[in-house]
């Protein structure tokens, strides 16, 4: 069995943070770092870092620490960044446009191919050369193009309908910004970003400290 399939979701959710911090270290020409030093920067314990990384192999050397470039490369591979991904955004409102304007996606290998919306005032416009198409063409577009991930940025009432179209056209990854928990088959991966949930978590923590 693939070892990665047995990795806990908690470890998986920490990997992007490792990747981001290692990228910053590379930009600052840091060649190596110990788990203790990484702990001070990233906020996890040194023991936790070693345990997490040991899930995927032996990356460090006692007395030397981690080679930053090599570790960043290995975590990139674990995260699947050794392959490019074609993406579409459904919903060209504020959130959709913000995502389309986020230039780091392309640096990570995520290629936003096009956007879809129902608003006649938006259809035909381009955001950073990304064209906004009529959502009525979503199914036919998916039939003709190789798309890996669909990003849903539509209102609550339309999100499940959009998800159904994505699933029907064999999209296996959905990044969902709509405030609804989608119903999809088990072989489709959904990552929810409910903005209000994050804000409510913040207010809870604020009140907890008072």
UniProtKB/Swiss-Prot annotation:
- Specify whether Membrane is a keyword of the entry: no
SMART domains, sorted? CoA_binding
Q: Which residues form the signal peptide?
A: none
SUPFAM superfamilies given in the database record: NAD(P)-binding Rossmann-fold domains (SSF51735), Winged helix' DNA-binding domain (SSF46785)
One Pfam family per UniProt: CoA_binding
A GO CC annotation given for this chain: cytoplasm
Please state what the protein is called: Redox-sensing transcriptional repressor Rex
Species whose genome carries this gene = Clostridium botulinum (strain Loch Maree / Type A3)
Q: Which UniProt keywords apply?
A: Cytoplasm, DNA-binding, NAD, Repressor, Transcription, Transcription regulation
Recorded name of the encoding gene: rex
Per its database record, what is this protein's job? Modulates transcription in response to changes in cellular NADH/NAD(+) redox state.
């Amino acid at each position: 069995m693939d070892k990665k399939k047995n990795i806990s979701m908690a470890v998986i959710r920490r990997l992007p943070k490792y990747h981001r911090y290692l990228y910053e270290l590379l930009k600052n020409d840091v060649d190596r770092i110990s788990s203790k030093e990484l702990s001070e920067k990233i906020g996890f314990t040194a023991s936790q870092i070693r345990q997490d990384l040991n899930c995927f192999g032996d990356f460090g050397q006692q007395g030397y620490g981690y080679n930053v470039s090599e570790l960043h490369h290995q975590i990139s591979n674990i995260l699947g960044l050794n392959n490019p991904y074609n993406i579409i955004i459904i919903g060209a409102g504020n959130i959709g446009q913000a995502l389309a304007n986020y230039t780091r996606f392309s640096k990570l290998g995520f290629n936003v191919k096009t956007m879809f919306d129902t608003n006649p005032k938006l259809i035909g416009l381009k955001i950073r050369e990304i064209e906004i198409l009529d959502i009525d063409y979503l199914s036919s577009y998916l039939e003709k193009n190789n798309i890996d991930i669909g990003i849903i940025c539509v209102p609550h009432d339309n999100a499940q309908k959009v998800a159904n179209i994505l699933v029907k056209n064999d999209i296996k990854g959905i990044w969902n910004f709509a405030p609804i928990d989608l119903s999809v088959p088990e072989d489709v991966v959904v990552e929810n970003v409910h903005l209000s949930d994050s804000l409510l978590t913040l207010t809870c923590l604020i009140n907890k400290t008072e």
